[in-house]
Amino acid sequence: MTSKKLVNSVAGCADDALAGLVACNPSLQLLQGHRVALRSDLDSLKGRVALLSGGGSGHEPAHAGFIGKGMLTGVIAGAVFTSPAVGSILAAIRAVAQAGTVGTLLIVKNYTGDRLNFGLAREQARAEGIPVEMVVVGDDSAFTVLKKAGRRGLCGTVLIHKVAGALAEAGVGLEEITDRVSVVAKAMGTLGVSLSSCSVPGSKPTFELSADEVELGLGIHGEAGVRRIKMATANEIVALMLDHMTSSSNASHVPVPPGSSVVLMVNNLGGLSFLELGIIADAAVCSLEGHGVKIARALVGTFMSALEMPGVSLTLLLVDEPLLKLIDAETTASAWPNVAKVWVTGRKRSRAAPTEPLAAPDSTTAAGEASKQMVLVLEWVCTTLLGLEEHLNALDRAAGDGDCGTTHSRAARAIXGWLKEGPPPASPAQLLSKLSFLLLEKMGGSSGALYGLFLTAAAQPLKAKTDLPAWSAAMDAGLEAMQKYGKAAPGDRTMLDSLWAAGQELQAWKSPGANMLQILTKAVKSAEAAAEATKNMEAGAGRASYISSARLDQPDPGAVAAAAILRAILEVLQSQGA
């Protein structure tokens, strides 16, 4: 079965892709009648060396993404995984020659079709009197025994584009550029690993891998690698890759003894997530530095892909300061990363976390008995939430990811652990602020953020007073913050429904002579009724808002949890005769 591809036609996909790149990049032009992209400022290259490269399509952004000042002059593209036509290569050579360049260097990956076609075009151009040289790049470090065909050309070719481009931009002659990049090409190695195959448009996958296997050392066209290994962690696979490509027992290895300086290239083969790419980059940096290798630059991204192949290749280039300056030289090529000219090894990679600001003076503190009461309230809230864990999870499975109870239990355990460390702040405002930070850090999820917002805002009115009107104002402030940032409103089937209902009842605390427990009892009953009523509501916020209302026939777990917290507070205060 062929895989799905977003193309207009199988036959025209390479042309369409190149046309799209040129259409969106004013510094590029197509060469009429050919699958060739050139710099649009060719006339500015008069008296300089031109650099041409290319190969089969399907390796984007290679090679056309590397056209620009300081890199390639132009690229000749073939059909997917197919060498470009000799006629198009020759047309590109003639085009740059007619623009007044003093010679052309062809940078070619080591594949038979590319060598033959670029080589034939070179000979024809030389017969016409055009100075043309060719460098064949073979940086594959997969095979321990070299075959007659030599090492395959892989992602390291892009580094040759960069070095040659910097030299050409500096006005260096054709012969010297050819000699210098030939030396550089021998000082690097690349090794890839794939989790599964890719597929050419209109065709089946190029190979199959078992679910627990990865292919080590495969080519960028899906060619077989050196062996298949069992799936392992990113750290283990990266360590294996680096060991294989630097081992002296490997005839195609790149020698990287301790103390060496390298440029590291972490290349996405097309289908790897950026998350995985970052993990692999970290593993590669740690592994190399652990072996005493100094990393001058680390280039991470997609440089030479194999269509949608989920895999990665690592390239190591041995560098000294002169070569590093060429890597760092400016370029306008769209696919070259903007990397700081700073050594990776030796750079301070973390900054000390800011110290917490000193607590602002607070005129309100709870007396000893009141402070003990706060501890009892918090302990009972924790016990209540732990007992509701499975019930809340069950309610959440209908409309979310089934972790509401787990999230609230995590908060309860964090609070219980915090209480064991010592007495909580005696100031209600400081207590709520501490709880806010604790929940933001430990509870997680949107619930942690919402409770954190609520408590942070609620703490503000309690800095000056802690009478009943101040506690009512605290409830108002917390609800306002939840609505402002959570974008929920009463009736949206969220925890806000319970808290809002309670908050309306607590307005009575602002009246002179208000009875604290009577009003709180009414507030809790209203919160519980509001929580139960959410089962008849259509969700307007949160994950449940994406679920059909026909499937929501249970109360919202967040609302149930909020009502249960209020009930726990009431029960402790009643037992204490507050």
UniProtKB/Swiss-Prot annotation:
Q: What is its EC number?
A: 2.7.1.28, 2.7.1.29, 4.6.1.15
Residue numbers binding ATP? 401-404, 446-447, 486, 494-495, 556-558
Q: Which residues carry this modification: Phosphoserine?
A: 350, 511, 545
Domain (DhaL): give its ranges. 372-571
Q: Which GO cellular component terms, listed alphabetically, does the Swiss-Prot or TrEMBL entry include?
A: cytosol
Answer yes or no on keyword Magnesium.
Answer: yes
The regulatory note on its activity is:
Each activity is inhibited by the substrate(s) of the other.
Chain sites annotated for binding dihydroxyacetone: 56-59, 109, 114
- Which of UniProt's keywords are assigned here? ATP-binding, Cobalt, FAD, Flavoprotein, Kinase, Lyase, Magnesium, Manganese, Metal-binding, Multifunctional enzyme, Nucleotide-binding, Phosphoprotein, Transferase
Extract the Gene3D superfamilies matched here: 1.25.40.340, Dihydroxyacetone kinase, domain 1, Dihydroxyacetone kinase, domain 2
Keyword Flavoprotein in the entry? The reply is yes
Reactions that this protein is recorded to catalyse: dihydroxyacetone + ATP = dihydroxyacetone phosphate + ADP + H(+); D-glyceraldehyde + ATP = D-glyceraldehyde 3-phosphate + ADP + H(+); FAD = riboflavin cyclic-4',5'-phosphate + AMP + H(+)
Looking up Pfam families in the UniProt record yields: Dak1, Dak2
Q: Which GO terms describe its molecular function?
A: ATP binding; FAD-AMP lyase (cyclizing) activity; glycerone kinase activity; metal ion binding; triokinase activity
Role = Catalyzes both the phosphorylation of dihydroxyacetone and of glyceraldehyde, and the splitting of ribonucleoside diphosphate-X compounds among which FAD is the best substrate. Represses IFIH1-mediated cellular antiviral response.
Q: What is known of its domains?
A: DhaK and DhaL domains have differential roles, individually DhaK is inactive and DhaL displays cyclase but not kinase activity.
The protein, known as: Triokinase/FMN cyclase
